[in-house]
């Protein structure tokens, strides 16, 4: 019987504890997954080594090498976390990738699909698992409270574009619960506009094997990051669905382009635009 039919015929709703228990590993497997993940993380940090030099002005070969290494590491970590990826549309290879932001998994997810350079909020550097990898692999951390920091990040993005490396931003400026898309901040779109590079919209959604939205791994608001991580590790399998739209020419001004991209990401995910987090 298909999973959807099994759920529909069940006396319990999809989010009932009975369904969650069937979707979860036991204590022994949970411990083994944590051990395997720790070993993979240690191995990944060793592989990254000294590739943590500033991006601005560095040799293009190092940019490509670091992005490719982050891709390999992300694929290995997602495998240990038992996250499978399903895509729709074409994965971009150049320019700027713009996506909604749901979970600490997003960076691993998108980098597993294409070698790229990320812009993330500074807090990500302190996140378990992905934080140390992001720091070593050259993620650009922005202090969003400092308006002057945008200029520094935009210069680094321009360097990545000059080297032909795909870059990715999360223009909501924060992560959400995934039920909609928050307003896009336009400031980091300027380098793509100046270079007249294509900007590709994308939408991310996480589901359980039963097709239920995996909102327990959405990290937003006052949610505890460790609880979200435990939920991911405890699950037998998580499905990440990434929908890519057609590249958009960056000819408009920043605010207009941000609005166009926001509408397209909403369309890709079939979710509404949200003015604020529910």
Per-segment meaning from a language model:
Residues 15-87, 132-136, 235:
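A transmembrane-helix-recognition feature enriched in membrane-embedded lipid enzymes
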Residues 121, 142, 170, 202-204:
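Generic beta-sheet signal
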Residues 129-131, 179-255, 259-260, 274-275:
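A cross-family acyltransferase "interaction/gating" segment
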Residues 160-188:
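Catalytic-site beta-strand/loop segments enriched in glycine and acidic/polar residues
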């Amino acid at each position: 019987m298909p999973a959807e039919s099994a759920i529909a015929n069940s006396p319990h709703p999809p989010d009932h504890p009975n369904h969650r228990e069937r979707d979860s590993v036991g204590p022994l497997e949970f411990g083994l997954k944590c051990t395997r993940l720790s070993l993979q993380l240690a191995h990944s940090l060793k592989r990254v080594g000294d590739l943590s030099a500033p991006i601005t002005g560095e040799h293009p070969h190092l940019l490509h090498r670091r992005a490719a290494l982050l891709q390999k590491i992300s694929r290995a970590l997602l495998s240990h976390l038992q996250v499978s990826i399903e895509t729709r549309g074409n994965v971009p290879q150049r320019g700027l990738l713009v996506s909604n932001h749901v979970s600490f998994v997003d960076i691993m997810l998108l980098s597993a699909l294409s070698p790229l350079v990320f812009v993330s909020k500074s807090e990500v550097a302190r996140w378990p698992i992905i934080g140390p990898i992001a720091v070593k692999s050259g993620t650009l951390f922005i202090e969003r409270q400092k308006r002057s920091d945008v200029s520094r990040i935009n210069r680094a993005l321009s360097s990545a574009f000059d080297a032909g490396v795909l870059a990715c931003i999360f223009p909501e400026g924060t992560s959400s619960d995934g039920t909609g898309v928050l307003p896009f901040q336009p400031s980091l779109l300027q380098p793509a506009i100046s270079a007249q590079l294509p900007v590709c919209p994308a939408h991310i959604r996480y589901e359980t094997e039963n097709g239920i939205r995996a909102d327990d791994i959405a990290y937003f608001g006052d949610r505890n990051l460790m609880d979200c991580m435990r939920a991911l590790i405890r699950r037998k399998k998580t499905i990440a669905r990434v929908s890519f739209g057609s590249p958009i020419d960056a000819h408009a001004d920043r605010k207009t382009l941000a609005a166009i991209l926001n509408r397209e990401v909403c369309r890709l995910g079939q979710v509404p635009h949200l003015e604020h987090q529910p």
